[in-house]
Amino acid sequence: MESKTSTYLRARFREYYLTASMDAPPGMEAREWGFIFYDTPGMRRHRSFRSRKELVDYIRSTVPAHVYHSAAYYLKPDAPTMKEKIWKGADLIFDLDADHLAEYRGSGIRDFREMLERVKGETMKLLEFLLSDFGFDERMISVAFSGGRGYHIHVRDKSVLKLRSDARREIVDYLTGRGLDPERFIHKIGVDGDAGVERARSLRGPASDAPGWGGRINKAIESMVMHLRELDDEEALRLLKNVKGIGKQKARLFLSQIREENAIKSIRAGNLDFFKHASGIWNLIIPYIMEETVRALGGETDEPVTADVHRLIRFPESLHGGTGLRVTSLSINSLHAFDPLKDAVVFGDDPVHVEIIRPTTLELMGERFDLLEGKTELPEYAAVFLLARGFAEVG
């Protein structure tokens, strides 16, 4: 980045910060703060502030490109080493970023809207886990658009404050469905005969109202069965034979039985043993269903971020130095309607002369820009974005 470009960006950022509200996070005085500047390499960290005013005055006077605070709370947040800081606990945080989604790794800004919509979907999925499976109070959860390629979730419930890294990794494992064992959900139970003597063993799965992954797996089983029932025999048999270990004979048996009137009712009750030889067939199908369920319903998040109890994360209402977009605080209810390419834009539309150094296509504020190398004039909001991203220099 040329010096005239960084000077221009600092001027625009200062303009924003002079009027931005910048509400401090809970316990701000116990958090470590870090800053990255356009004209200085590395991060300036191990800072602490006793009040919101002190923090805001610092940001307005120094105009950083990026502002971070720790998820952790410390006795001495400005101490130079972690040991000296004395850790008191940390929020449970989740970083959902397009880089965690295989189809968007290394993608440019051409796919920005589609990419952000996909990450928003993953964020909403993870929030559902936190609210329904873990039972966190919605008031203890905050969400923020990162200003870049994703979203952050902060859980500030007392129950998570003292969790160490291994416990936080276990939470990520649950959210992502990593290591789910079919035997945990599918098992045989004894069926009593005369005088209490066990006469048989029946295959059981989770019922439709089972909590957590159990309920999700039941609904996935029902969904698969309903789909197979709607297909003609040839197509249904073809799909079943894709499951390892299921040949034509087993596929025909399974298909005929799931088309029986009581099949769906039995599945919803968790009874999978409603036809002869059911056990052997279900034992082949269930792992396949679970794999597909985890792929479709499991959350996506950056495990190292969640597990790191000393992590720094972006300060909501600050600007992202790599886009010029605002790190935007959101309620869970407002997330669905939030459009980061409009709602996180803070700059106006005054014309700015820039030189495009990398051809690109950009969509911001409902406008599409198809840009080739060379000098051009852009509205300020688009110019700031491209300058911050390194696609342009001040003309």
Curated annotation (Swiss-Prot):
An annotated GO cellular component: primosome complex
Cofactor: Mg(2+); Mn(2+)
Organism the protein comes from: Methanothrix thermoacetophila (strain DSM 6194 / JCM 14653 / NBRC 101360 / PT)
Function: Catalytic subunit of DNA primase, an RNA polymerase that catalyzes the synthesis of short RNA molecules used as primers for DNA polymerase during DNA replication. The small subunit contains the primase catalytic core and has DNA synthesis activity on its own. Binding to the large subunit stabilizes and modulates the activity, increasing the rate of DNA synthesis while decreasing the length of the DNA fragments, and conferring RNA synthesis capability. The DNA polymerase activity may enable DNA primase to also catalyze primer extension after primer synthesis. May also play a role in DNA repair.
Catalytic site positions: 95, 97, 302
Subunit structure, as described in the record: Heterodimer of a small subunit (PriS) and a large subunit (PriL).
Protein name: DNA primase small subunit PriS
Family annotation (CDD domains): AE_Prim_S
Alphabetized GO MF terms: DNA-directed RNA polymerase activity; metal ion binding
Presence of the UniProt keyword Lipid biosynthesis in the record: no
EC number: 2.7.7.-
Gene responsible for this protein: priS
